[in-house]
Regions:
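Conserved catalytic phosphorylation-site environment of P-type ATPases
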Residues: 77-85, 187, 288, 298-374, ...
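P-type ATPase nucleotide-binding
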Residues: 354-480, 489, 501-517, 525
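Transmembrane helix-loop-helix hairpins at the membrane interface
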Residues: 13-138, 240, 249, 256, ...
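Helix-interface capping motifs at the ends of transmembrane segments in multi-pass membrane proteins
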Residues: 31-48, 55, 67-78, 82-103, ...
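Membrane-embedded transport module
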Residues: 261, 524-527, 564, 569-642
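Conserved ATP-binding TGD loop and adjacent catalytic N/P-domain core of P-type ATPases
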Residues: 416, 442, 448-592
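Conserved cytosolic catalytic loops of P-type ATPases
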Residues: 130-223, 328-371, 413-414
């Protein structure tokens, strides 16, 4: 069986020591087999040399079969191979044919197949092992002006570490000195560097490209982003899909069944011929068919290729910055027909910006300038948006007599003129007639020197590729898209219409979102799965309640990594459709392998039972099918162009 573990020391696709030893054994066996066929040695010496060759190529299989028998786990592929090959030896001795080639060939090609699948698994692990390379080996701890290299586990919260160019960021923290560019590709799949400067948060696992950074740590290594991600990936193999569980249960029933069937094939027809038909029993013919039947029946194509397909799919997704917590979630994701979004941070940037300016006799730039100056003392998000739109340093000497009226706005003198900045209530308080605005967003009205000057529209900005992301979801097979938001109905409906979202539910509190998701779950069929996409902030209850929770833009968000089933490391909504496409490709490959292996196996079993298929045919039906299935499985790694 395939063990879905991660080898952190894996480098590239080279063979490991065990694989090299197996290759040497295979080559020695081939040389000996060719020599024995050319030399035509006879008698006991010939048998002895073939047995030596058999032990060289098959001693590990013999050992595993013996351990299985001692542990009362008899029926596995090792047992099948041992019975088939020893039976072939016994049959050759009984017939005095001295042709032991088939017995050796069965074990030889089985081992070639095992080596191939081992190498394929190693190659498929490459993507996840590259992700494992984000684990930092050390941290440069700065104490009393001296830098010492220590294990990241030894660094306490609040310590200062130095990250040199080319080094991995070992712990999460805040930059207190320096600026640089970070390579985040191992985390997000994004090839473009991310620029950082003093005051920016920085997460572990990124690679510092050029500048020297001093970082004040905010988390211990065990709680850092890199540790959370590594734990997530390493545990992904423990969560089995229904397909994998089916194959495991199938193998437990199938292998004993074919063993007893082979025994029946070896005994019943000869006995029927002898006692009921008065014919020669031909035990050698039926035993040969039974041995062929056993070789064909080996289920390794299924038990290897199915988990390998999921492993490759998870590995390919991780390379694109999509972390799937297990093959069960990959399978559920492939069945997603309804996608519900939390609007803020997923479809929109979650950052308020000035989206429109409507003025009376004052130009746009001056209206924004007066608004920003009047709001200079406020820390409200609306004030920040106005100051950002102004884009210049605030000259506070131009502003006096600032008065903030809670829930309404701000009064101030700017350059000696009375300025009022706020909502409709503030205009009504000052008895200043104002114009209603029908655009979605927050409307900031302005009056200067007692006269209405216009209004500024501030809204949450829709991500540039959000509409394309919705379209891609439809192409990926999603039947319905839904937007859940706490925004006002009018603003929510305008965003939904802009993005072509099918349904929108607005003015929802966090608890209301959970109730709405439960309502949506009860209204769908069991075969359809509902995915909820959030940014991980206050979304944990909904992420866990949906059939599958997807956290987007989760770099540095512990809550998202903990609560979600699928974690998208950047905030690109296009990744949602990509994740679904990857899951569909992976499941398609799984079903292809299951159908292909079963059809070929049962067809060849029938041919073996009636005597059409010989041992060489059986070798192809076993090893050939496994090789084809494994080659198909590793296609799940290729996901970049989806």
């Amino acid at each position: 069986m395939l063990r879905l573990t991660v080898n952190r020391n894996l480098k590239g696709g080279c063979m490991n020591k065990k694989q090299k030893k197996m290759l040497i054994r295979i080559l020695i066996t081939i040389v000996l087999l060719v020599a024995l066929n050319l030399l035509h040695i006879k008698g006991v010496i010939n048998l002895g040399l073939y047995l030596v060759t058999y032990v060289i190529i098959g001693y590990d299989i013999l050992k595993k079969a013996g351990i299985g028998i001692l542990n009362r786990r008899v029926f596995d592929d090792n047992f099948l191979m041992v019975v088939a090959t020893i039976g072939a030896f016994a049959l050759a001795i009984y017939e005095k044919s001295a042709d032991y080639n088939e017995a050796i060939a069965v074990m030889l090609f089985y081992q070639i197949g095992e080596l191939f699948q081992s190498y394929a698994v190693r190659r498929s692990r490459k993507n996840i092992s590259e992700l494992m390379d984000i684990r930092p080996d050390y941290a440069n701890l700065l104490e009393d002006g001296q830098i010492s290299r220590v294990s990241p586990d030894e660094v306490a919260i609040g310590s200062v570490i130095v990250v040199q160019p080319g080094e991995k960021v070992p712990l999460d923290g805040v930059i207190i000195e320096g600026n640089s560019s970070l390579n985040t590709s191992a985390l997000t799949g994004e090839s473009l560097p991310r620029d950082v400067k003093e005051g920016d948060e920085i997460i572990s696992g990124c690679i510092n490209i050029n500048g020297v950074l001093k970082v004040s740590t905010t988390k211990e290594f065990g709680e850092s982003t890199v540790s959370k991600i590594l734990e997530l990936v390493e545990n992904s193999g423990t969560r089995k899909s229904k397909s994998e569980k089916f194959i495991s249960k199938f193998a437990m029933v199938y292998t004993p069944f074919v063993c007893y069937s082979a025994l029946a094939l070896a005994l019943i027809p000869p006995l029927v011929r002898m006692f009921f038909l008065n014919l020669s029993p031909d035990f050698d013919v039926w035993v040969y068919r039974a041995l062929t039947f056993l070789v064909i029946s080996c289920p390794c194509a299924l038990v290897i290729s199915v988990p390998l397909s999921f492993f490759a799919g998870i590995g390919g997704a991780s390379k694109e910055g999509i972390l799937v917590k297990g093959s069960n979630f990959l399978e559920t994701l492939s069945q997603t027909k309804i996608v519900a979004f939390d609007k803020t941070g997923t479809l929109t940037k979650g950052v308020f910006e000035v989206s429109a300016v409507h003025h009376s006799e004052m130009e746009n730039a001056r209206l924004i300038e007066y608004a920003a100056l009047a709001e200079c003392a406020s820390s409200h998000p609306i004030s920040k948006s106005l100051k950002m739109a102004y884009g210049k340093e605030i000259d506070r000497s131009r502003v006096t007599d600032i008065e903030e009226i809670s829930g309404e706005g701000v009064l101030a003198k700017v350059d000696g003129s009375d300025v009022a900045v706020g909502n409709g209530k503030l205009m009504e308080r000052l008895n200043i007639p104002y114009h209603e605005c029908h655009l979605s967003g927050t409307i900031v009205h302005m009056a200067i020197a007692g006269e209405y000057s216009g209004h500024i529209v501030i809204s949450d900005v829709v991500k540039p590729n959000a509409k394309t992301a919705i379209d891609e979801l439809k192409k990926a097979g999603v039947r319905k898209t839904i937007m859940l938001t706490g925004d006002r109905k009018k603003a929510a409906e305008q965003v939904a219409e802009l993005l072509n979202v099918d349904e929108v539910y607005s003015e929802l509190l966090p608890a209301d979102k959970v109730s709405k998701v439960e309502e949506l779950l009860s209204g769908k069929s069991d075969r359809e799965k509902l995915a909820f996409v959030g940014d991980g902030i206050n979304d944990a209850p909904v992420l866990t309640r949906a059939d599958i929770g997807i956290a987007m833009g989760a770099m540095g968000s512990d809550a998202a990594i903990e609560a979600a089933d699928v974690v998208l490391m950047d905030d690109n909504p296009m990744q949602i459709a990509k994740a679904i496409k990857i899951s569909k490709k992976c499941l398609g490959i799984v079903y292809q392998n299951i159908v292909f292996a079963l059809v070929i196996k049962f067809g060849c079993l029938f041919l073996g039972a009636i005597g059409v298929a010989n041992m060489w045919f059986a070798i192809f039906a076993d090893v050939g099918v496994m090789v084809i299935a494994v080659l198909n499985a590793i296609r799940a790694l290729r996901v970049k162009d989806l």
